[in-house]
Amino acid sequence: MHKQGVKLTSLLALALLVASCQGDRGGIIPATPSGQVEVLGAIPHAGTAWTEGLIVSEGSLWESVGGIPGSEVRGLDRETGAILWSVPNGGAFFAEGMVRAFGRTYVLSYTEGQSYLFDRDAADPFEPFASYEGEGWGLTAVGPHLINSNGSSSLFYRDPDTFEIVKTVPVAYDGEPVPDLNELEFDGKYVWVHQWRTPSVYRIAESDPSDVVRYELPPQVCPEGYPNGIAWDGELDLFFVTGQKCESIWKVRFH
């Protein structure tokens, strides 16, 4: 076959290949999926708060705020953002991720290597629980385990009674490890995690950690600081998202 015929045949083959990769979306299907974020509204948030953990509990938001001094756990009205109560830790440690599970409220420390049990009505609201190696970042609970992050590209499943590591799960997207995994949440099916200093949120299927979807928070979500705080509200069927130095808590849905 002469060169022109070879060229025409090659172009036809390429066109057929592209067409075979196209679906109803009218574009080439990406190797790794990305999702969309629907912003529903916002409530005020203290712009001075260095948010490290955010959860929904007892119909309100609970927030762990980092700082030395200045770390505390506070309750927020989920309709207005008003602070309902606040319990400082007296500068004992830099508070990080938090979760309420197994009849307890666990709070991590940043570099102190110590976890705590929080009880706002106790004489000592922050009772030392278990020590661990490395840094403490995000924290959530899945099934019979706690899960924490430490700024690496892995998640650590832990025994809720001893805080011993049960298994380690690496997180990758598009074939590359995802570094700086931070604040965590679990909605009953997926683990959600912020990537520090980015607008990226990753959804990880608990049943298959290789099933990962990335979402990019829009520019209006926490333009003042770093997004780092994600709380699932099953009653309202939405997520609350805020961050470090953010002046709002945003209500969003991920699609």
Where are these regions (language model features)?
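C-terminal motif of bacterial Sec signal peptides marking the signal peptidase cleavage site
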Residues: L17-S20
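Bacterial signal peptide processing site
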Residues: Q22-R25
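A short beta-strand motif characteristic of beta-propeller blades
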Residues: E38-P44, A82-P88, D124-A130, K167-E176, ...
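Beta-rich, blade/repeat-based domains predominating
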Residues: A46-E58, G91-A101, Y132-G143, N148-S149, ...
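Conserved beta-strand positions in repeat-built beta-propeller and related beta-rich domains
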Residues: W62-I68, Y106-E112, L146-S152, V193-R197, ...
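Short loop/turn segments that connect beta-strands within beta-propeller blades
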Residues: D77-G81, D119-A123, D159-F163, A205-P209, ...
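Blade-loop segments of beta-propeller domains
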Residues: G81-F118, P125-G138
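Hydrophobic, well-structured mid-protein blocks that either form specific transmembrane helices
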Residues: S115-D174
